[in-house]
Regions:
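Enriched but not universal
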Residues: 1-41, 71-73, 306-312
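Bulky hydrophobic/aromatic "packing anchor" residues in well-ordered structure
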Residues: 117, 284-286
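Short amphipathic beta-strand/extended segments with alternating polar/hydrophobic composition
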Residues: 114-121
Length: 312
């Protein structure tokens, strides 16, 4: 959830110095251990998957990025660490064959040290059929795309690790949540990203993106031709929806974009409403993008990843 940066009072009654806080949002960087520090806390969040473009059916949502974190003795870490914040998955457009991009991996690496969080799966091409949402990113692998074909609307599988009893439905530990099958909502996760919502070919509303307690929310799906678009999944929740609110009529995309935060993770973007301009981007870090509506509107881009390092 993030470390509080306010000064603290030690046992001696003296005010301790503020921790050294460094936030990385670019794809490459270097962290140098501050002199005198004894503890280091690290958070890494993978990029969100992009939402799928609609195609005679609503577009499906992208999966959210995972969160990984740890507290370390400063003496156990190398003097420098290489840092990479994963990019958000590209929006599904004609230029991407209607496919939303898979979110990038965020990592902190050094001699004998690795901490990673993987990105969410992108929305698939619906091809005029029901289609499955992108899987949420995990702490050992990225989420996968779902499928959209006659008789096959399978959801994208959440990223690893594989955890016994957590291969279907909502996930736990670092496993990413599965996307929604067909027009169903995305599944929820603990440290993995929430699953993107599945989309329907028939008329009717979209489905909600899956949420995550510590990871980022998945994107909602767009509508076929009428009804209310699916809402994005939320950070700090284990119930689908709760992120950007899906709407039932045209509005500016900014109205239903996922919430971004300087702590925790981002929420998923909502799907496109009827006549809308496309699915909304996911919030940063890690929110999945929303799906477009049936009339060939683009999906929303996934939220970028992020790395935060606190030393004191």
């Amino acid at each position: 959830m993030g470390l509080v940066t306010a000064n603290t009072v030690g046992l001696s009654g003296l005010v301790a110095p503020k921790p050294n806080v460094q936030i990385f949002t670019a794809t490459s960087g270097t962290w140098t251990k501050p002199p005198g520090c004894t503890r280091v806390y690290i958070e890494v969040i993978g990029g969100g998957g992009g939402g799928g473009r609609g195609e005679s059916a609503g577009g499906n949502g992208g999966g959210g990025g995972a969160m990984a974190r740890g507290v370390y003795d400063a003496s156990a870490l190398p003097a420098t660490l290489t840092v990479a914040a994963g990019a958000g998955g590209a929006a599904g457009t004609t230029g991407t064959s209607y496919l939303g991009g898979i979110g990038g991996t965020s990592s902190v690496t050094g001699s004998g040290f690795t901490l990673q969080a993987f990105g969410g799966g992108g929305g698939c091409r619906p091809n005029g059929y029901d289609s499955g949402g992108g899987g949420g990113g995990g702490t050992s692998s990225a989420g996968a795309r779902g499928t959209g074909a006659s008789g096959d609307d399978s959801p994208g599988i959440g990223g690893g690790p594989t955890i016994q009893g957590s291969t279907t439905g909502d996930s736990l530990g670092g496993r990413g949540a599965d996307g929604g099958e067909g027009p169903a909502a995305g599944k929820c996760a603990e440290f993995g990203g929430g699953g993107g919502a599945g989309a329907r070919a028939a008329s009717g509303g979209g489905a909600n993106g899956g949420s995550s307690i510590f990871g980022a929310g998945g994107g909602g799906s767009g509508v076929r031709s009428s009804g209310t678009a699916g809402s994005g999944g939320a950070w700090s929740s284990y119930t689908a929806g709760g992120g950007a609110t899906g709407l039932g009529s045209w509005a500016l995309i900014a109205t239903y974009t996922g919430t971004s935060r300087d702590y925790g993770c981002g929420d998923g973007g909502a799907g496109s409403p009827p006549g809308g301009d496309g699915g909304a981007p996911g919030g940063y870090p890690g929110g999945g993008g929303g799906g477009g509506h049936y009339a060939n509107s683009d999906g929303g881009a996934g939220g970028r990843g992020e790395v935060r390092i606190f030393a004191w």
